[in-house]
Amino acid sequence: LGDAGAFNVNRAKELIPSVQLYSSNPRNTGINIRGLGSPFGLTNDGLDAGVGYYVDGVYYARPAATTLDFIDIVQIEVLRGPQGTLFGKNTTSGAFNITSRKASFKPGADFEVSYGNYGYIQAKASVTGALTKKLAARVSFSGTQRDGLIDNIATKRATNDINNLGFRAQLLYKLNNKTTITLNGDNTQQRPDGYAQVVAGVVTTK
């Protein structure tokens, strides 16, 4: 996924057969598997999807979550077809099951920077290690920026840019050799200058 630049579901769908994601903005997002899932349009704002989205076993109830950047993940599992037996409701079309990297008592750190055209730059970092003999932590960061792709002649600025920031913190408590307790928390912000729409190939836009 990293080599392909798939830092969210919208990018990852290009690598996953039968998955479609349509999004003009996070509140107006539809995700389908094999053509079924949720409608695309203003009618889906606030509605549960037919494709379940899970991160470390936690259900994200709104399709808008699929527009967020992945933060320090280890795998993406795409389950096609009804998954009610394993995941419960809202999985009539399938489910995304995402697993993040866990905190470790062994010290470690990762850092990655990517760049591209239109001022695209992405930075990812994570640090993990022991705090005490029974407590370990992991802190992760992801930031993505890109200049706008559409010139707004009224404001003299490029719009439809990317401005994403995400953080995740984990605590791992080792109660004994058979029992561990994990506490996760994350925060993600999207602050783009969008979402401009243009008429393509019909009239001159002004």
Q: Would you name each region that the model predicts?
A:
Residues 1-6, 96, 174, 180, ...:
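Short intrinsically disordered, low-complexity coil segments enriched in acidic
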Residues 32, 82, 158, 201-204:
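Juxtamembrane/interface motifs at transmembrane-helix termini
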